[in-house]
Structure formats: C-alpha cells, structure tokens
Amino acid sequence: LSLRRQRQMCIRDRDRTYKNAIELMKSLGVGIKEISIKDACIQHMNDIEHDESVKDITYENTQARERTQILFDMANKHGKLLVGTGDLSELAMGWCTYNGDHMSMYGVNVSVPKTLVRYLVEYVAHESDEKTKEILLDILDTPVSPELLPPDENGKIAQKTEDNIGPYELHDFFLYNFVRFGFDKAKLKRLAQKAFDGTYTNDEIEKWLNVFIKRFFISQFKRSCIPDGPKVGSVSLSSRGDWRMPSDASFEDFIK
C-alpha cells in the first residue's frame, strides 16, 4: 500500500508465532503494540455464562471476535485502515470467524489462494536480508493454525488447520477447477487423482473433496458480506464481482 513502515502497526499472538511476529516486526521496522485479550475474553464469557474450561466454538470465536474488535477500534483511534489477512482459500472453506477475522476494512489477500501465499512469502524471503529471510522461512515451516485453542503439553501448536479440514493444496486445486470451469464432483475427483497420483490415495481425495464441497456450500453466507479487495488471479469469490450464489444453496445434490 506504499505506506511508511513506521506508521504501520502490528498486533501479535503467542510462543513460536509470537517470537516470529516480534522479530519480523523489528526486522521490518514497523510499529509494535502488544494487547492482551485474556481479561476481555474472560469477562465476555462470564457475561454470557459460558464456562471458559469448555473449549468449544464459543470459546474459539470469542477470541477471534475480540481480536477483531481491538483491531477495528485501534484503526478508528489512529484514523488508519485495518488490512485483513484472510485469503481466498479460507474464504472458500469458511475457515474464518464470522465478524471475526472474516471482517476488515480492506481484504488485500481476498483473491490469493493459500498455496500462492506460501510461494509469495518464500519469494519475499529470498529477496530480503538474512534476518528477515530466516524469520519468514521459519513462518513457512510453522503449521497453519488460528491458534484459538491452548497448546499441547509440549507447548506446541495443537490446533492445526490442515488436520481439521484437509490439505490446502488439494482444496485450492478443487477450488480453481470448480469455480473457473464448473466441473462436477466426478470430474474434480478424476483430475485430482491424476494431479496428485502418488501423493494422496483415492480414498483421501474422496474424503477431502467431500469436505471441500460441503464447506464451500455452507460458507456462502460469509462470502455474501466481505470487505472490498483486489482481484489478483482468474478466480474470485466476491459477491460483488465474479461469484453469486444463494447462501441457502444445498451441497447434498452436488456431493452425490
């Protein structure tokens, strides 16, 4: 966005990702502000009478929406633009909290699939100084996670996105061929079997294709109200542009 780095503000999460976030911000010379969401989330869960020991979707989304509220309020306070980090793959799969990370003032990555994000980060890493490169490559080596659940007993990330919804390289493949060419389930499966022969079994492809179709259909309501963002490639899910779909469309006929 051609903004001076010193005028950009970043807010962090925890542990390995926390260390990388802090070191990357220092390396890039951007402003750093650390705000804890713990007390606010505990207060909110008390207000709605939710037991904070129950690590369910309410527990997770409370954190996601509190993060977003802080970011919006900080943007208002400083008269700045809240730039969203969500990408095309997350939007397709609905892997975002409605009115949490789903929302921003401008979705700069909204038409960039997750697999391309990785290539872009790797490219920037190799174009950067050694310190920044080291940090970015470690970020690429970190499991994809919203980090809304506590870490495991070793302090490692326990909530891994691809363990829950499947490999992004498969989902991005399904997404491109479904939206760009309108292929049905049978053809998507045949193409994936050819493209990923030796990487995924037929049963794995079938399993994750069913997950993709179901999540894509039931997540349309999130895509019907998203912030503005650029169209980068040949596939876009903006309801104001390339993609129009009723939010109550059923996946059941398509998945047969």
Predicted segment positions?
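Single conserved hydrophobic/aromatic residue that forms the stacking wall/gate
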Residues: 1-11
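Generic, well-ordered alpha-helical scaffold segments in large soluble proteins
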Residues: 8, 23-31, 40-48, 65, ...
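Catalytic cores of large soluble enzymes that bind and process phosphate-bearing ligands
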Residues: 10-17, 33-37, 59-66, 109-113, ...
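A conserved beta-strand->alpha-helix junction
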Residues: 14-58, 64, 90, 135-146
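Aromatic/hydrophobic pocket-lining residues that form π-stacking "cages" and hydrophobic walls in ligand
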Residues: 21, 71, 174
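Active-site adenylate/phosphate-handling loop in enzymes that bind or generate adenylated species
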Residues: 28, 49-130, 148
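Acidic/polar loop patches that form or flank catalytic/metal-binding clefts of enzymes
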Residues: 33, 82-84, 118-119, 126-141, ...
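Peripheral terminal appendages
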Residues: 56, 61, 95, 100-105, ...
